Amino acid sequence: MSALLSPDQLEADLRAIGARLYHDQHPFHALLHHGKLDRGQVQAWALNRFEYQRCIPLKDAAILARMEDPALRRIWRQRIVDHDGNSATDGGIARWLHLTDALGLDRTLVESGRALLPGTRFAVQAYLQFVSEKSLLEAIASSLTELFAPNIIGQRVAGMLKHYDFVSSDALAYFEHRLTEAPRDSDFALDYVKQHADTVEKQALVKAALHFKCSVLWAQLDALHVAYVTPGIVWPDAFVPDRDASRVAA
């Protein structure tokens, strides 16, 4: 039977999971960050990623609803504000739509979800189901992928600005905000997990939760790679840049 880890040992194990499985290791991200994708492939990435962005506040609301401690709720609810904003023109969702606008995608198409890859939809729904059905500790632990976000954000912004003349720093404003939001959120979640994962069984559960979340992010990139890189098998109802030219703004 495994021994109970100290909080710092648990953190080390969690960071090791991220180092091995976080989606910064996925080949699609290497292509994106090194300028190896064309405009249509970048559009497909942004359109599909919106489904994940759209569901982040739904995920956080599901977690919030299960918190009995008002102090904990006051901290967690900031995540919802970060993405929903205080109006329709601010927050993470609005900033992601600003990116898809800048890439030339029709906003109605993006928001409708009509052109999503099935793999994107299924991965995001699996994540929502996970945080709704698992323990609060597991749900919070699943958010720990944010520990690794600042590094990939830095790579993404620098790489996209360097290699794509159709991308501007203004279009990438979403990521600038996440550079401060993600560390704040992950620091809190990590402290919570280290404090509350106080048995061998709970420690195994939080590690499994992070492993699962990494698989959710990886699966979304798998779907994009199969459809838009190789072998190029696109779901008939999903976004296809050439075919959908009439549905993409000029």
Curated annotation (Swiss-Prot):
Gene: pqqC
Stated role: Ring cyclization and eight-electron oxidation of 3a-(2-amino-2-carboxyethyl)-4,5-dioxo-4,5,6,7,8,9-hexahydroquinoline-7,9-dicarboxylic-acid to PQQ.
BP GO annotations: pyrroloquinoline quinone biosynthetic process; sulfur compound metabolic process
Molecular function terms, GO-annotated: pyrroloquinoline-quinone synthase activity
The enzyme's E.C. designation: 1.3.3.11
Pfam families recorded: TENA_THI-4
Top-level class of the enzyme under EC nomenclature: oxidoreductase
Associated pathway: Cofactor biosynthesis; pyrroloquinoline quinone biosynthesis
Keyword set, alphabetical order: Oxidoreductase, PQQ biosynthesis
Name of the protein this chain belongs to: Pyrroloquinoline-quinone synthase
Catalytically driven reaction(s): 6-(2-amino-2-carboxyethyl)-7,8-dioxo-1,2,3,4,7,8-hexahydroquinoline-2,4-dicarboxylate + 3 O2 = pyrroloquinoline quinone + 2 H2O2 + 2 H2O + H(+)
Gene3D superfamilies assigned to the protein according to its UniProt record, in alphabetical order: Heme oxygenase-like
Family of this protein: Belongs to the PqqC family.
InterPro entries listed in its UniProt record: Haem_Oase-like_multi-hlx, PqqC, PqqC-like, Thiaminase-2/PQQC
